Curated annotation (Swiss-Prot):
Mg(2+) binds at D9, E58. One of its GO terms (molecular function) is holo-[acyl-carrier-protein] synthase activity. Pfam families: ACPS. Gene3D superfamilies: 4'-phosphopantetheinyl transferase domain. Keywords: Cytoplasm, Fatty acid biosynthesis, Fatty acid metabolism, Lipid biosynthesis, Lipid metabolism, Magnesium, Metal-binding, Transferase. Belongs to the P-Pant transferase superfamily. AcpS family. This is Holo-[acyl-carrier-protein] synthase. It catalyses: apo-[ACP] + CoA = holo-[ACP] + adenosine 3',5'-bisphosphate + H(+). InterPro entries: 4-PPantetheinyl_Trfase_dom, 4-PPantetheinyl_Trfase_dom_sf, ACPS, Ppantetheine-prot_Trfase_dom. Its EC number is 2.7.8.7. GO terms for biological process: fatty acid biosynthetic process.
């Protein structure tokens, strides 16, 4: 396997909190998949949840080398946790098509957060 892409993103929690205070759930609806939206609505710290998901999705878009354009949308990258809590990515719609075109065989996600920041790194292999 070869590394096809690497992406990293860091998000300031206060920035996401300001957007949520200003525009309500608009950012969450645009960024989150349906499954993530359900978790967001029930989460004890929804801003923190959203910031972490946003960081991962930005890192995935960077790893693909495309950013969010040409039919790609944040909600096509779904972040979920395995039984041990490790973050993973599930791809939908155009994101899944792009992964197939690129020959992606695995996507690795690392996510860290502290009081003020969330940081994600994504490696795509094929």
């Amino acid at each position: 396997m070869a590394v096809l892409g690497l992406g990293t993103d860091i998000v300031e929690m206060a920035r996401i909190e300001a957007v949520v205070e200003r525009s309500g759930d608009r950012l969450a609806r645009r960024v989150l998949s349906e499954a993530e939206w359900e978790l967001y609505q029930q989460h004890q710290q929804p801003v923190r949840f959203l910031a972490k998901r946003f960081a991962v999705k930005e890192a995935v878009a960077k790893a693909f080398g495309t950013g969010i354009r040409n039919g790609l949308a944040f909600n096509q990258f779904e972040v979920f946790n395995d039984g041990l809590g490790k973050p993973n990515i599930r791809l939908h719609a155009r994101a899944a098509e792009l992964a197939k075109e690129m020959g992606v065989t695995s996507i690795h996600v690392s996510l860290a957060d502290e009081r003020r920041y969330a940081c994600a790194t994504v490696i795509i292999e094929g």
